[in-house]
């Protein structure tokens, strides 16, 4: 099995932070998949915008290409992408819940619908948990894929929701770990 960290195949990250109490407020931010602040990736790897690949495929050096900011899909075999998320929460507030929504899958050469890959999620250096992605999907064309996207490449991922609450960390409402908002 491969070990990857936090991302593979997202158009954007949708982050919601909810405060508790009578003044409940929700702060949201949409972060493009190409807006990572640090990375370490190994081939097979690459990025693409809605109109073309960013640089050359399987060349990690293109992850610093200026066009990476417009990426709509990112993939790599092993490694990580790190994001700096905006924090609009007022000082001395208590975060009740943090939710991150994304599309994700494994990364296999070309694609392989059965390709288990461990993906570890972390926040502020704290490991939230590991989930095993079942595959890298190419059995049908992706709903939003551009016409130029090759049919022999990954076509879509799974829509996932990572939620951190006072009770722990959950992926699609299934407990991933005991790491809570209070520990972050």
Which ranges hold each PLM region?
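Short N-terminal segments
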Residues: 2, 18-29, 33, 154-156
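Short, surface-exposed tryptophan/glycine-enriched loops
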Residues: 141-184
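Mid-protein regulatory/catalytic core that forms ligand/cofactor-binding pockets
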Residues: 23-146
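Basic, Lys/Arg-rich alpha-helical nucleic-acid-recognition elements, primarily the DNA-binding modules
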Residues: 1-18
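Residue-identity detector for glutamine
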Residues: 1, 12, 25, 56-59, ...
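Generic hydrophobic, helix-prone segments enriched in Leu/Val/Ile
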Residues: 15, 95-98, 159
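Enriched - but not universal
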Residues: 1, 13, 78, 134, ...
């Amino acid at each position: 099995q491969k070990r990857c960290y936090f991302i593979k195949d997202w158009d954007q990250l949708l982050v919601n932070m909810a405060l508790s109490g009578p003044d409940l407020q929700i702060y949201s931010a949409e972060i493009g998949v190409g807006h990572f602040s640090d990375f370490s990736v190994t081939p097979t790897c690459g990025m693409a915008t809605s109109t073309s690949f960013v640089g050359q495929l399987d060349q990690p050096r293109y992850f610093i290409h200026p066009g990476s900011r417009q990426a709509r899909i990112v993939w790599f075999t092993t490694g990580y992408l790190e994001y700096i998320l905006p924090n609009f929460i007022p000082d001395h507030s208590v975060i009740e819940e943090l939710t991150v929504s994304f599309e994700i899958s494994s990364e296999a050469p070309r694609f392989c619908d059965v390709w288990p890959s461990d993906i570890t999620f972390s926040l502020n250096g704290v490991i939230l948990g590991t989930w095993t992605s079942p595959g890298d999907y190419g059995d049908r064309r992706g709903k939003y894929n551009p016409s130029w996207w090759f049919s022999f490449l990954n076509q879509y991922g799974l829509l996932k929701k990572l939620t951190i609450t006072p009770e722990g960390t959950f992926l699609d409402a299934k407990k991933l770990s005991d790491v809570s908002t209070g520990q972050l």
